[in-house]
Amino acid sequence: MSIDINWEAATSGPDGEALAERIRSFIHDKFQQIALPRFIRSVEVNSFDFGTIKPELQIKDLCDPFEDFYEEDEDNEIGDGEVSDIQDRSPKPRPSSAGNERSAADAWQAEHPAFLDDRLCGRIEPHDVPIPSKEDPLASRPIRSPMSFGDPLNPYFFPRAGTPGIPGGTSNLGYYYMPLGGISGTQTPLSSVPRGPFSPGLRDASVFGEPSNSQRPNPSGPARRQSEIDIDTGNSRPSTADTLDSLNIHGIPDPVLPRSSDDAHPNVLPRRDNSPAPRRVREKRPEDLQVLCRLRYNGNIRLSLTALVLLDYPMPNFVGLPLKLNITGLTFDGVAVVAYIRKRVHFCFLSPEDADTLFGADDTNEAGHLQSRDSLAGGINDTSYSSRRPHDSLLRDVRVESEIGRKEDGKQVLKNVGKVEKFVLEQVRRIFEEEFVYPSFWTFLV
């Protein structure tokens, strides 16, 4: 189905002039953001005109709008009647009953290294130090010296590797924590040295043997113990994950380190609350409509630009010559997408690859082989830049006129600057494809 467009009514009058000025200002701003080559100082867009030739539209399909058209931009204002249409498609955060504790802990972490695990960073609630009773077997446990390495049944007692100049070596396997010691420097806290044999709540295997029947049996206990012995015989620092696993072998919770739900996965760092903002998606309605139509244009649209070209003779940046470029027409053939969702109209073009996927390859290359118009006289060059392959760009053919310097006896001082023309036309194509080709699209309020 073809559509007849009243091109003159749409592009003339105050509304048409305002639209043309907005397009000129938009292209000019885009050129100010482009890194110019060394031989061009600046590029200015002077004017834009729609021309008198109208495009041809042919409707190809009516379907549901693309999913991207339902996403709500954070910068867009939402009316009172549209608030209920916004849906949140992100996972809901888990409720927390300790908001003040979390904020205090996050403030503490901001002043400390972030690579440490939360369980070993000192996030410990105030508590009373338990005093062992006479009936507690832990109270009668013998105190071992850091130099006592003779117990063959305890996998923690291994001699430290010798280092020249440092008595006893540098391995941290010989440092043990005494709960009531409190001497700084000679003992290392449990939070920084894992697998200390005198950690609170950790039973010594050489004294008490296997766990009692009241504790939950762990079938993987003996295999785990053997693997720990094989791993700990090296001189490397023991793994932090093995520390927490060894506490669970005997089924005894640690009274110093608070347990959390993240302890079930000791190798996974705790999740931070820095997830990206949720996507706001509008609710779909039956009246939403999208039109896919083929747009062909071979018209006399005009765009006037001025580029200041630098001359390096007889010295660098000796003089700048204004190069005036006039785009006098172009040939376009592509698939346009117009989606109507309530009070918004979304507009874009499909890339040639996407268009071929939807409708098949184009068997007629009429737009790519149209002849350019006759050249204008008076010392103005007319150059036609066509794509070598039909699908390189939606802009199949761009006709440009170049004029540089002043005229003497009807002739230009410099008749053609091919590099400047090529650069400007490549940027015009790039701006069009980046701003108008899907997934980029424009939204209009109606």
Curated annotation (Swiss-Prot):
Q: Which InterPro entries match?
A: Mdm12, MMM1_dom, SMP_LBD
Q: Which domain of life is it from?
A: Eukaryota
One Pfam family assigned to this protein is MMM1
Kindly state a single biological-process term from the GO annotations of this entry.
mitochondrial genome maintenance
Region entry Disordered, spans: 75-106, 126-145, 188-283
- Polar residues composition bias: which ranges? 233-246
Q: Which residues belong to any copy of the SMP-LTD domain?
A: 1-446
Major location category of this protein: mitochondrion
Q: Where is the composition biased (Basic and acidic residues)?
A: 126-138, 260-274
**A single cellular component GO annotation:** endoplasmic reticulum membrane
List the GO molecular function terms.
lipid binding
- Is Aminoacyl-tRNA synthetase among the key words of this record? no
What keywords tag this UniProt record?
A: Endoplasmic reticulum, Lipid transport, Lipid-binding, Membrane, Mitochondrion, Mitochondrion outer membrane, Transport
Chain intervals with Acidic residues compositional bias: 75-85
Places the protein is found: Mitochondrion outer membrane; Endoplasmic reticulum membrane
Mode of membrane association? Peripheral membrane protein
**What does this protein do, in the record's words?**
Component of the ERMES/MDM complex, which serves as a molecular tether to connect the endoplasmic reticulum (ER) and mitochondria. Components of this complex are involved in the control of mitochondrial shape and protein biogenesis, and function in nonvesicular lipid trafficking between the ER and mitochondria. MDM12 is required for the interaction of the ER-resident membrane protein MMM1 and the outer mitochondrial membrane-resident beta-barrel protein MDM10.
**Record family assignment:** Belongs to the MDM12 family.
The protein's assembly and partners: Component of the ER-mitochondria encounter structure (ERMES) or MDM complex, composed of MMM1, MDM10, MDM12 and MDM34. A MMM1 homodimer associates with one molecule of MDM12 on each side in a pairwise head-to-tail manner, and the SMP-LTD domains of MMM1 and MDM12 generate a continuous hydrophobic tunnel for phospholipid trafficking.
Query: Domain remarks in the entry?
Result: The SMP-LTD domain is a barrel-like domain that can bind various types of glycerophospholipids in its interior and mediate their transfer between two adjacent bilayers.
Q: What is this protein's record name?
A: Mitochondrial distribution and morphology protein 12
The gene coding this protein = MDM12
